[in-house]
Curated annotation (Swiss-Prot):
Membrane-crossing segments per the record: 56-76, 89-109, 130-150, 151-171, 193-213, 239-259, 276-296, 339-359, 378-398, 403-423, 439-459, 479-499
Pfam families in alphabetical order: Nramp (PF01566)
Record: glycosylation sites: 11, 19, 307
Gene Ontology MF annotations: cadmium ion transmembrane transporter activity; manganese ion transmembrane transporter activity
Region (Disordered): 517-552
Entry keyword set: Glycoprotein, Ion transport, Membrane, Transmembrane, Transmembrane helix, Transport
Protein's recorded name: Metal transporter Nramp7.2
UniProt xrefs under InterPro entries: NRAMP_fam
Record's subcellular location: Membrane
Functional description taken from the UniProt entry: Probable divalent metal transporter.
Membrane disposition: Multi-pass membrane protein
Length: 552
């Protein structure tokens, strides 16, 4: 009987949301737990009286923190190899990737702002038990895969600065991260500002080098706007670029970070918040695009120069983060390696912060578990150290560099399991009501998303079949490997199809009753109660997420 009454309430409210009026729907706590009310978040909120630029600054933080992940060692490694191997031909991947990143990061922010819940919490509510656990495990794997480049990048930086073996540097990364998390207690904003400054110092060096080597503007523009995948390994490098740019854990992170901001509970207030978060993300990702453009352009120009010395030609043939400092010699001279190493160290540590928070939100959302930051980071880092240590001992610097590319490809293959739920939730009337994505955003995001998924599946299948044909293993070994791998590929494809076509079954949003104008007016103006009818919850201010060290 209760289920019938709830369904009747849904039927009464959802049509009102579709009549074209701007009724802001309220979050329904389907878990049965009371959400905290923020009684000071109404039209009298001081934020509502601020000038536009001051109001915008009060929302700044989440987008820039997320954007640090677009400048991590994984991005630098894939950029360097893309430039060295293909010159400017893969710049279009960077352009499309960051445009798509802006779309989905804004969708993640809007999802959190509109629902009062972040992506992992909504996944827990929507999907069956075993699907939920599989998504949680895949999300944790994405955090670990994203941490591998930070481990190796930090080890490379320590190798350049102190001439210690790479594998020893890998072991040291566990201690360096604990030191970083310990320093947060003494001024995390200052620490993050210092890290950001060092990262942008390295970016400035690449911009300076680009002005020195003067890449062909025509070739750069062709690379940006004419898609091409020619040459050996181009498809793999393109997938690695996408994996380094569009990371699954960033979607969970951004949808949670926005909840640390206080927003007035009105249509105008929440729409303003979505608008400001979009502007912030757009500005941050534009800077990230320019930096990635500079790195690829410098790498492509220097490594294709006709007067390249034999020593540098050998470096370009197997370019890694550990050997890339020579690219900055024209700007920095003999000090290029030291300055580059310090900036590389900062790049690795900045991404450690975002990875720690993303892991916390994923665990809290899916499993309702919380860990102290240092424990959470230590567990993730220890798991990431294991493959990095083995590869660095066996393969040295070049092997560790290839592991970064492999980790980026893993992130690209992991993407559908965070992206598809995000696209479905943000386009769903039962989740977002009238504030779901416009038809244009739905079409564009699904085309780009399915395009990336299709490329991944194509590369996975053709690459594996080609490897089976060309390797020197005995036929029995090939058959045994095929028996294991082909079912896994089929499971991957079926899982993507399941997430894509599964119909959402949980209604998490209800609008004001269409027969109660007072309720509709109250929701429009940010009031919490109507004179008649059921009391409706606000889109909650998440006090449990308000300890994020972001600038006020």
């Amino acid at each position: 009987m209760a289920g019938i009454q709830q369904q009747q309430l849904v039927n009464d409210t959802l049509p009102a949301s579709l009549n074209g009026s701007s009724n802001r729907i309220a979050s329904v706590n389907v878990e049965g737990q009371p959400q905290p009310w923020a009684d000071d978040l109404d039209l009298q909120d001081p934020n509502h009286q601020k000038p536009g630029w001051r109001k915008f600054l009060s929302y700044v933080g989440p987008g820039f923190l997320v954007s640090l992940a677009y400048l991590d060692p994984g991005n630098l490694e894939t950029d360097l190899q893309a430039g060295a191997n293909h010159r400017y031909e893969l710049l279009w991947v960077i352009l499309i990737g960051l445009i798509f990143a802006l779309i989905i990061q804004s969708l993640a922010a809007n999802l959190g702002v509109s629902t009062g819940k972040h992506l992992s919490e909504l996944c827990k509510t929507e999907y069956p038990k075993y699907v939920k656990y599989c998504l949680w495990l895949l999300a944790e794997i994405s955090v670990i895969a994203a941490d591998i480049p930070e481990v190796i990048g930090t080890a490379f930086a320590l190798n350049i600065l102190f001439h210690i073996p790479v594998w020893v540097g890998v072991l040291c990364t566990g201690c360096s991260t604990l030191v970083l998390l310990g320093l947060q207690k003494y001024g995390v904003r200052k620490l993050e500002l210092l890290i950001a400054v060092l990262v942008f110092v390295m970016a400035a060096c690449f911009f300076g080098e680009m002005s020195y080597v003067k890449p062909s503007a025509t070739d750069v523009l062709k690379g940006m706007f004419i898609p091409k995948l020619s040459g050996q390994g181009a498809t793999g490098d393109a997938i690695a670029l996408l994996g380094a740019l569009i990371m699954p854990h960033n979607l969970f992170l951004h949808s949670a970070l926005v909840l640390s901001r206080k927003m007035p509970n009105s249509v105008r207030g929440i729409n303003d918040a979505c608008h400001y978060f979009l502007i912030e993300s757009g500005f941050a990702l534009f800077i990230a695009f320019l930096i990635n453009l500079a790195v690829i352009s410098v790498s492509g120009t220097v490594c294709s120069a006709q007067n390249l010395s034999s020593e540098n030609a050998d470096r370009c043939g197997d370019l890694t983060l550990n050997s890339a400092s020579f690219l900055l010699q024209n700007v920095l001279g003999k000090s290029s390696s030291k300055i580059y190493a310090i900036a590389l160290l900062a790049s690795g540590q900045s991404s450690t912060i975002t990875g720690t928070y993303a892991g916390q939100y994923i665990m809290q959302g899916f499993l309702e578990l919380k860990m102290r930051k240092w424990i959470r980071n230590l567990v993730t880092r220890c798991i990431a150290i294991a493959p990095s240590l083995v590869v660095s001992i066996i393969g040295g610097s070049s092997g560790a560099g290839r592991l970064i590319i492999i980790a980026s490809m893993i992130l690209s293959f992991e993407l559908p399991f965070a992206l598809i739920p995000l696209l479905k939730f943000s386009s769903s009337t039962t989740k977002m009501g009238p504030h779901k994505n416009s038809i244009y955003i739905i079409v564009i995001s699904w085309i780009l998303g399915l395009g990336i998924i299709g490329i991944n599946i194509y590369y996975l299948s053709t690459g594996f079949v080609g490897w089976l044909i060309d390797n020197n293993l005995p036929k029995v070994g090939n058959v045994f490997i095929a028996i294991i791998v082909f079912p896994l590929m089929a499971i991957y494809i079926l899982a993507v199809i399941y997430l894509t076509f599964r119909k959402d079954s949980v209604v998490t949003f209800l609008g004001p009753n269409k027969n109660d104008p007072q309720q509709q007016a109250n929701m429009e103006n940010g009031l919490t109660k109507s004179t008649e009818g059921p009391e409706m919850e606000r889109v909650p201010y998440r006090g449990d997420l308000a300890d994020i060290p972001l600038p006020e």
